[in-house]
Amino acid sequence: MQALARSYAHRLKVVVSFLMIVAVLLMIWIARSKAAKPAVVITMMDMPASFAPMRTTIQAGDTVEWRNTGNQLHHVTTDPSTALKKNDVSTPPGAKPFDSGFLKPGESFSETFSVPGVYRYTCAVHEAKGMNGEVIVQK
């Protein structure tokens, strides 16, 4: 009888341990899937050279992802030192400029916005063609 009780207790420990491991893995998976999801996806297009949508409104703490779905290089920046026209880019007071660098076809860039205000950005490659956009971040 004691052997049967020990066997049952051992099986119970194994099952409980397995369920705890599954629960931890599930919590990690849920946390990653929530963190990885952008609030908005902006598509970078070739013809005409443009962002879609051109203007978007999000909440502070949200993430925006720019995806190069075209066949050309694209670039997303709010950095005045990268822009041809300084008026094409801006960040609100207290926010740092961001710059994706060159994005090849199929690549993407994400930015999480914590400072409320208006962010004006451009594609440094196609700025002369008017490829500009705006993210409005609300509190």
Q: How does the language model describe each region?
A:
Residues 2-19, 23-139:
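Extracytoplasmic copper-binding redox domains, predominantly the cupredoxin/blue-copper superfamily
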